[in-house]
Amino acid sequence: MGKIIKSLSRFGKKVGNALTSNTAKKIYNTIGKAAERFAESEIGSAAIDGLVQGSVHSIITGESYGESVKQAVLLNVLGAGDEIPDPLSPGERGIQTKIKEIEEEQRNELVRIKYGKEIREKFGEQLEEIYQFMNGEVKGEEEQEEQYKVLCKAVDSYENLLVTENEQMRTLARALQREATERTENESKMVKEYRQKIDALKVAIEVERDGMQEEAIQEIAGMTADVLEAASEEVPLVGSGMATAIATGRAIEGAYKLKKVINALSGIDLSHLRTPKIEPTMVATTLEHRFKEIPDKELAVSVLAKNDAIVANTKEIKHIKEEILPKFKKIMEEEKELEGIDDKKIHPRVMMRFKVPRSQQPQIHIYSAPWDSDDVFFFHCVSHFHANESFFLGFDLGIDVVHFEDLAAHWHALGAAQEAKGRTLNEAYREFLNLSIGSAFTSPMHARRMIRSKTVHPIYLGSMHYDITYETLKTNATEARYDEDLQMHILRGPLHFQRRAILGALKFGVKVLGDKVDVPLFLKNA
């Protein structure tokens, strides 16, 4: 368990300190009065931006340009309408979620229509039975299958999909790690197809990168959903890997509505079992290798990173199958004896016993302080049920403080074994507000508002799913609290833009590109 409290870094912070510090005279003697006046006037009007800010910052504070303004890119390829929402705007997030769900359903249905026969041959006819249970015609009482059996079939089918996808990804990773001469014919074909997709993705990212400004935080956008889907999927489970509708594990699960059936019959929500469409490490690798080919071994690292998400999902479904379903069956039998319920049906009361409170589901939960809400907000990030971990990441943008803490595990019906360590969310929240109250940089009004906020519960603003693994999410949070270079790039612009950038850095990660600039030449022409 860990707790870290740290001051956030912004551009201009050290510059301002340098201009008013006791060492300022030495700095002025070094850079000359002209540069001093130029810097002071620009800082005073808050107009230093882009390369200008980076260069002046470097000269005045004596830092290298490597610690100043560069290009910062979110490690996410965005399709149309995929912009990151403001975490403090539930309406904005809700609309985006609904649009994405509709688009996913359409694409998944296309996969079922196109590859239905091949999918059923590979994964069994029970997939069609599950689909018919959810979408088929209403059958008579005597024809209806026992609901618990359908539930078990859905869980087994989902596990089978994840295990198969895991094997395929490992095969591709092994092929990429081998020398070209040692690959089998099938491995060579897989690598060739994957390389073609990566080349297409690299070209698309290059086009976007060329159009970026040398300032602020950028997003790679402009690819249609179909092109994105085709370019980012490593291996199809059925059919061609170069088609626009690719039969991946995620697409097959959605096409046959496995998670929906499990939720409808048991009340167990598995919507958190996701894999990133495009692995953030893949985008980072592509950005690093701008004018050269990406080595096979680095591609293998990205494939294995995406496979980590599949492995975590496989562990989760095994946890549900081995730990939860036996308990579910036992409670079902008890309810039947007590209430005399029909053998074929699962009583809603049984489902309610396995419901997890919304605030404890494996998602990123967003809260804000009741007062000064625009500046003071925090994320409660919860892991998969089988891992039963969570952490707190709080920001006060008014006084530039970040607070990270590992929290105690929750108890709920789907959780793994409990371990009594760590503090609760409320305890972490109150300490976070105490920081703001006691800080030397806090205004009296802000301190009063934080004291008032401490006496009541924070405002819950909803939640968001994350596609990466919980460990990667935690790594991104670590970078957000430690990496000063990253903080300087995400804490720029209007407040709502800064909050979006923080959420993007948490969900996807940010790559700061270190393009060199000739500082003496820049100053000569300044």
Curated annotation (Swiss-Prot):
It is found in: Virion. Pfam families: Orbi_VP5 (PF00901). InterPro entries: Capsid_VP5_Orbivir. GO terms for molecular function: structural molecule activity. GO terms for cellular component: viral outer capsid. GO terms for biological process: symbiont entry into host cell via permeabilization of host membrane. Keywords: Capsid protein, Outer capsid protein, Viral penetration into host cytoplasm, Viral penetration via permeabilization of host membrane, Virion, Virus entry into host cell. Residues 1-42 are annotated as: Involved in membrane permeabilization. VP5 protein is one of the two proteins (with VP2) which constitute the virus particle outer capsid. Acts as a membrane permeabilization protein that mediates release of viral particles from endosomal compartments into the cytoplasm. Permeabilization activity is probably negatively regulated by VP2 and is triggered by endosomal degradation of VP2 and exposure to low pH. Belongs to the orbivirus VP5 family. This is Outer capsid protein VP5. It comes from Bluetongue virus 13 (isolate USA). The gene is Segment-6.
